[in-house]
Amino acid sequence: MRATCRVLLNLLILASVLCPHPVWAQTTTKDGLARYLDGQTEHLSQVAMEIWDLAELGYQETQSAELLAEELEAHGFSVERGVAGIPTAFVASYGSGHPIVGILGEYDALPGINQDRVPERRPIEGKDRGHACGHNLFGTASAAAAIAASEWLKATGSEGTIRFYGTPAEEGGSGKVYMVRAGLFDDTDVVLTWHPSDRNDASPGSNLAVKSAMFRFRGVSAHAAAAPDRGRSALDGVEAMDYMTNLLREHVPQETRIHYVITAGGEAPNVIPDYAEVYYYVRHPDPETTREIFDRVVAAAEGAASGTGTTVEVEVMGGSYSRLPVESLQRLVYENLKAVGGVAYDQEEQRFADLIKETLGTGLPLGSQEEIQPFEWEQGYASSDNGDVSWMTPMGTLVTATWVPGTAAHTWQAVAADGMSIGVKGMIVAAKAMAFTAVDLFSDPEKLTEIGQEFRDRRGTDFRYDPLLGDRDPPLDYRLRGGG
């Protein structure tokens, strides 16, 4: 009998060594969550690299979205696919009750740029798209943070819901706006998000609202030399519109940005073109001012059509609000980012970074990837569809050094880093910072109340959401027809 008991005791001791504690028993603290995520790094890297290889464009991210959805399902999340009328959008939830903390995840790639995982310019033959904005890392880190937060909820028995939003087509497709319009954020208490970058930063700030549209002019074709009087040039309509819009630049607020590209203008000089089109972006820090300036650009198009004997059709392609900052939430994100720390390179990564740095201009120096940038107001001049989310619920943001310092977004240098271990290290920093922040939000109802009050004060009591893109359906084929 004693021998039998001794054998059983030895077996129990061996089991405790091989399987010391279930995952939930290790994730009651932030340190435990950090160790949990460190232990998942190899697997998370595989997920991110698979999405990097797929490089699926906006609204076409079928495999990338499914990969993340299945990952979340495997960890006990319930997943609703095809939300907001978008096949590649989904919402994954774990837990019950409030607070509801959302985490945004993106996974669309960019067209027209690709690069191998090497520190010199080397496009991949036969590939015409790539993750030049790091969304392969974005979606993966956000899913990892959501899973880590779910492990904390399980381990502590706390009430609350962690929700992952799978958000497609950020790059010009305004995917999140349709999700906002569908009411998917109406009950969310706080949302967290991040973005790949060349630095670690969680400063408060905002960016620009944007409204974009395609202007399609139609005229009458004729021989440009033999019968010019019979023609009505659609290209003249475009050029007249562009001229008037360029005059308009003197009479708009200082912070306004207007850009355009002629996407069709005829095929031969001796044929008066009966079709031409021009693609416009209008930006300003204030969403309503953006709307007003856009209407003036439309008036220029209508005047151009009238003056050139052509017609014009306007298709709104996208639109998003500027980001509404909540400083108390940003301070919380910042403190957690500081607690996690920056990105440290090993020797191989340092050699990679040295070679990449030789191809870059001015910018942050090597070594800054290990630091956290100071907490200070930042005005950005790009736009993102997460702006609309930030007007529905408080949104905390951060960026991490997934790229070599000095790297800009939408470059081959970004694609290269997004596909190797430097990107993965920055991704893990982001996952930890968001998981830590989610834990704080679940744990501290007073902080949540403070954040909510600041959000309501900044938004104002008379706010009514009116999406800049109007009531149009999601342009699921916008990448297939060259939009964005």
Regions found by a protein language model. Give the residues of each.
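Histidine/acidic-residue-rich, glycine-tolerant segments that coordinate divalent metal ions
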Residues: 121-130, 136-137, 153-273, 283
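Bacterial N-terminal signal peptides
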Residues: 8-21
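Acidic/His- and Gly-rich active-site-bordering loop/insert found
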Residues: 27-131, 136, 140-161
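Metal-dependent amide/peptide-bond hydrolase catalytic core
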Residues: 26, 239-484
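Glycine/charged-rich beta-loop-alpha catalytic/anionic-binding loops adjacent to active sites
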Residues: 118-132, 218-222, 370-373, 411-420
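Divalent metal-coordination and catalytic microenvironments
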Residues: 51, 92, 103, 135, ...
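N-terminal secretory signal peptides that target proteins for export/translocation
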Residues: 1-5
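Acidic-glycine-rich active-site phosphate/pyrophosphate-binding loop
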Residues: 108-122, 206-216, 403-411
